Design a protein with these regions (language model features):
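Residues lining hydrophobic/aromatic ligand-binding pockets adjacent to catalytic sites
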Residues: 1-283
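Long, low-complexity, compositionally biased intrinsically disordered regions
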Residues: 271-393
Length: 393
């Protein structure tokens, strides 16, 4: 088949503090504004963790180029918490999210809504059909399975019936099989790391192995969306631009961004960790600071060290629960439910980027190191499973 389709490639999310040293020239410039000059599309990852505010969606529309394309993840309250019990509650939540995304849909900037299912969700054709029948009309959808039982002909038949795109993945759980089930295609590169997936830098050979698959898909549909989700350290930017270069699709602006990303990543690997002065105190302390830097960003972590010890009051800190007060703010963490509830002003922004704020960092630096290491390792290894929340008012 002739290769006539569009291939729009970007990253999963764009507002990562650690990308400033690799991709973004400064920390003050609008990240979406700069990002949209380099990439034609982005996957909105923050909507998976919380419903966006109406003004935020309007802002995405207003401050992005006319032909820019967003794809948004459906909130996990729908796909993970309400999925088993289909009915009016989940239908209302779907309608609520769809209505919030209308500004992007009406302006032609919304490609599709992504349904990311939990690993526990196993093959059930009747349940899947019932769920797909509840999806609001007027939108396109892609669906990502996390269990191998879905890899069968019946699944492709159902998805084709509803024109829902099967999400082709590169990840540890499922094989990178190519299945086209809609008039567009969706590819996600998650990384192949173990602790977690996303902390992974694809090699040139690993990317080259994907070229035949990308070309096959691109020639079968009108539009192919591709997103690199290995966002740690800015790897997603470099890998995404690298595969575009291999496909001979790199623009001059992207070529310059790729050179800058490669140079900055190389220099980052060569220089010592910038927070070395805070790692004194043994191997556990060094590991704790290193892990915190990964899930906070060095700027927020550095600010954690500036908070006086007397500003922190620890009510409880063990392997099950953390209950603390930092200045006028509260923090409650629960290991069993994987929940973090906090109320500082920066926390609302941190929720969007899936990072811890300086106050949480300070608490984790204050409690016993072995306890803190257990918590930070659990968050680092399974970031997607954790719920970042504000107190209910």
């Amino acid at each position: 088949m002739a290769n006539t389709g569009r291939f729009l490639l970007g990253t999963s999310g764009w507002s990562y503090a650690e990308w400033v040293a690799v991709f973004y020239p400064t920390s003050t410039e609008s990240k979406l504004g700069f990002y949209s000059k380099i990439f034609p599309t982005v996957e909105i990852d923050s909507t998976f963790y919380a419903f966006p505010k109406e003004g935020m969606v309007i802002g995405w529309d207003r401050y992005s180029p006319r032909n820019f394309v967003f794809n948004a993840k459906i909130p996990q309250t729908i796909t993970h918490e309400r999925l088993e019990a289909l009915g009016k509650p989940i239908e209302e939540e779907l309608d609520r999210f769809a209505n919030l995304m209308l500004p992007l849909n009406n302006s032609g900037k919304l490609g599709c809504l992504l349904i990311q299912l939990p690993p526990r969700y196993k093959f059930d054709s009747n349940h899947l059909e019932e769920f797909l029948s509840l999806l609001p009309h007027g939108f396109k959808y892609a669906i990502e399975f996390r269990h191998k039982s879905w890899l069968r002909d019946e699944t492709w038949r159902i998805l084709s019936k509803y024109n829902v795109a099967y999400t082709i993945v590169d990840e540890p759980l499922l094989p990178p099989e190519v299945h086209v089930t809609a008039d567009f295609a969706y590819i996600r590169w998650h990384g192949r790391g173990q602790r977690p997936w996303y902390d992974y830098h694809y090699t040139e050979k690993e990317l080259a192995d994907w070229l035949p698959k990308v070309k096959e898909v691109e020639g079968s549909v009108k539009t192919t969306y591709g997103y690199f989700n290995n966002h740690f350290h800015g790897y997603a930017v470099e890998n995404g631009l690298s595969i575009l270069k291999m496909l001979d699709k790199l623009t001059p602006a992207q070529e310059e961004a790729l050179k800058r990303a490669r140079t900055n990543l190389r220099q980052a690997k060569e220089k010592p960790v910038g927070l070395g002065e805070f790692t004194r105190g043994g191997e556990d302390r060094a590991k704790l600071v290193d892990l915190l830097g990964t899930i906070m960003g060095e700027t927020r972590l550095a600010r954690s060290f500036t908070i006086p010890d007397e500003d922190v009051k620890i009510k409880e800190a063990n392997l099950k629960t953390i209950d603390a007060k930092i200045r006028d703010y509260t923090l409650k963490m629960d290991m069993a439910s994987k929940t973090i509830v906090h109320d500082c002003g920066d926390w609302e922004r941190a929720i969007e980027t899936r990072q811890l704020c300086k106050h949480i960092g300070k608490v984790l630096l204050t409690i016993p190191e072995q306890v803190a290491l257990t918590w930070v390792s659990a968050i680092h290894e399974n970031l997607d499973a954790w719920k970042f929340q504000q107190p209910r008012k």
